[in-house]
Amino acid sequence: MLQPKRMKFRKMFKGRNRGLANGTEVSFGTFGLKAVGRGRLTARQIESARRAMTRHVKRQGQIWIRVFPDKPITSKPLEVRMGKGKGNVEYWVCQIQPGKVLYEMDGVPESLAREAFALASAKLPIKTTFVTKTVM
């Protein structure tokens, strides 16, 4: 599972997920999976989608993960009264804005990449679209 090795502070404010994304172009591979909606991806969802893609392309080509879960999400245990401080860190998420490239792929035919990204997209809670690298 992806998570930061060290952080200056253990817990974080909830914050808001507004604005536009950085990393909107396919830069490493030839094909990419781009977010259309906004939301947040957990480390488990990122890993699950990666496994689905890797298995479908039978470990040929190369896959890049362009997102990293760097925000801790806390929760309190069940049946605990309010107060007594913020809960413990339960999992890590990555906030996604529209236009962000989530995954990239290279070294496979376009048809295979489309199928792999469709499988990965089914594992994710946000709408995505298939994009290719634009050459100027």
UniProtKB/Swiss-Prot annotation:
GO terms for molecular function: rRNA binding; structural constituent of ribosome; tRNA binding. Keywords: Ribonucleoprotein, Ribosomal protein, RNA-binding, rRNA-binding, tRNA-binding. The keyword Transferase does not apply. One of its GO terms (biological process) is translation. InterPro entries: Ribosomal_uL16, Ribosomal_uL16_bact-type, Ribosomal_uL16_CS, Ribosomal_uL16_dom, Ribosomal_uL16_sf. SUPFAM superfamilies: Ribosomal protein L16p/L10e. The keyword Ribonucleoprotein applies. GO terms for cellular component: cytosolic large ribosomal subunit. Binds 23S rRNA and is also seen to make contacts with the A and possibly P site tRNAs. Belongs to the universal ribosomal protein uL16 family. Part of the 50S ribosomal subunit. NCBIfam families: rplP_bact (TIGR01164). This is Large ribosomal subunit protein uL16.
